[in-house]
Amino acid sequence: MTTIVSVRRNGHIVIGGDGQATLGNTIMKNNVKKVRTLYNDTVIAGFAGGTADAFTLFELFEKKLQIHQGRFVKSAVELAKDWRTDRMLRRLEALLAVADKNTSLIITGNADVIQPESDVIAIGSGGPYAQSAARALLENTDLCARDIVRKSLQISGDICLYSNHFFSFEELIHENKDII
């Protein structure tokens, strides 16, 4: 699996992920880029699960964004519905963490579209470790979103066998948000 973390703070939205790809219990590659920008760089997304499956889902989500003219939540719900009902898509094994300037979501193959209660999302095998670290850092430090994501990924990479310390990041800035 992997670790993907998303944090919102002071108008900055960052999604970061580790780079490890495994096949069974063997590390196949250390520098996979699991985060991407979509829809003219207005959406950021990260995946946990099968790489080919995730790229398929990225493409489908971007098509939904185009069809629905960038309406983020509507596009996520429509993707989840298709994922659940289409016989071929149902076989895809991945989770997506996606964000635009206003909203962060987790999209699953069970037709779940989940908006977190807090400003943190973490998915993948290292997700629980990263989420715990990110929440603690968000609540108890003044670190920026990117530094929180980086430190959370480092902690997860130290604990989770299926995560490493090669990180990639994507960031959005909410221009209308007052940065304190």
From Swiss-Prot:
It catalyses: ATP-dependent cleavage of peptide bonds with broad specificity. Its main location: cytoplasm. One of its GO terms (biological process) is proteolysis involved in protein catabolic process. Pfam families: Proteasome. Keywords: Allosteric enzyme, Cytoplasm, Hydrolase, Metal-binding, Protease, Sodium, Threonine protease. Na(+) binds at residues 157, 160, 163. It is found in: Cytoplasm. One of its GO terms (cellular component) is proteasome core complex. The keyword Transferase does not apply. Allosterically activated by HslU binding. The keyword Kinase does not apply. The active site is at 2. It comes from the Bacteria. GO terms for molecular function: metal ion binding; threonine-type endopeptidase activity. InterPro entries: ATP-dep_Prtase_HsIV_su, Ntn_hydrolases_N, Proteasome_sua/b, Proteasome_suB-type. Its EC number is 3.4.25.2. A double ring-shaped homohexamer of HslV is capped on each side by a ring-shaped HslU homohexamer. The assembly of the HslU/HslV complex is dependent on binding of ATP. Protease subunit of a proteasome-like degradation complex believed to be a general protein degrading machinery. Belongs to the peptidase T1B family. HslV subfamily. NCBIfam families: ATP_dep_HslV, PRK05456.1. This is ATP-dependent protease subunit HslV. It comes from Wigglesworthia glossinidia brevipalpis. The gene is hslV.
